[in-house]
């Protein structure tokens, strides 16, 4: 299991390095230029971008010799799937750290650029939940479909994740009165819903992969 996870991390590393360089430059710009829109963009791009990096390389699961060789190793198919899900979580946390450092430096030099400090929580919740929903949708599609269509699957996953987040936010805004308590409840609801979807997706993907023949 550790070997599978290590391989997934290394497989993502080349894309993540390029994206990290972009995020560092973007972060410097965000610290120098005190603009709320820039900060929002950095949060969303940073957290979601690293998750996309893990999904892009998943195509190698079936198109390389390593992908087929893994099936001969003394590991279960559930372990193979679990390593993919854990890999996304790890890189999601990396993206969250990048964003946290940049926002911290921006607040240090310019103060909070949002109308309320609690708005930062909302941005984090939106980005994290979109990343989790994206993975929850992508992996079952990927393992049920064909590796050659992985690009189509992750585009579908991103669009669906955005739609789900917008739907949840719209419903909560209609049910809750404006206020800090409502903002916190909304952020927590997004995280809980996305985590639940991620967990259910894992079980579904294991079921799909265990029945698939190669």
PLM ranges: what are they?
Residues 71-77:
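Short helix-to-coil transition segments within interhelical loops
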Residues 1-65, 83-214:
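Hydrophobic alpha-helical transmembrane segments of membrane proteins
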Residues 79-81:
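Alpha-helix N-cap/helix-start motif at helix boundaries, enriched for small hydrophobics
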């Amino acid at each position: 299991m550790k070997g599978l996870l290590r391989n997934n991390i290394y497989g993502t590393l080349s894309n993540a390095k390029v994206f990290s360089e972009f995020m560092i430059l973007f972060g410097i710009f965000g610290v120098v230029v005190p603009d709320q829109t820039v900060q929002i963009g950095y949060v969303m791009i940073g957290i979601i971008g690293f998750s996309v990096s893990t999904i892009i390389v998943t195509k190698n699961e079936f198109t390389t010799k390593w992908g087929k060789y893994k099936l001969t190793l003394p590991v279960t198919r559930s372990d193979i799937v679990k390593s993919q899900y854990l890999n996304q979580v790890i890189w999601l946390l990396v993206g969250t750290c990048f964003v946290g450092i940049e926002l911290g430096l921006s607040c240090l030099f310019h103060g909070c650029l949002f109308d309320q400090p609690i708005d930062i929580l909302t941005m984090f919740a939106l980005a994290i939940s979109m990343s989790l929903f994206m993975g929850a949708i992508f992996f079952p599609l990927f393992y049920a479909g064909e590796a050659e269509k992985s690009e189509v699957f992750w585009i579908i996953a991103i669009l669906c994740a955005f739609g789900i987040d917008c739907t949840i936010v719209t419903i909560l805004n209609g049910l809750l009165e404006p206020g800090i308590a409502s903002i916190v409840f909304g952020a927590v609801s997004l995280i809980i819903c996305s985590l639940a979807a991620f967990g259910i997706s894992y079980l579904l993907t294991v079921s799909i992969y265990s029945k698939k023949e190669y």
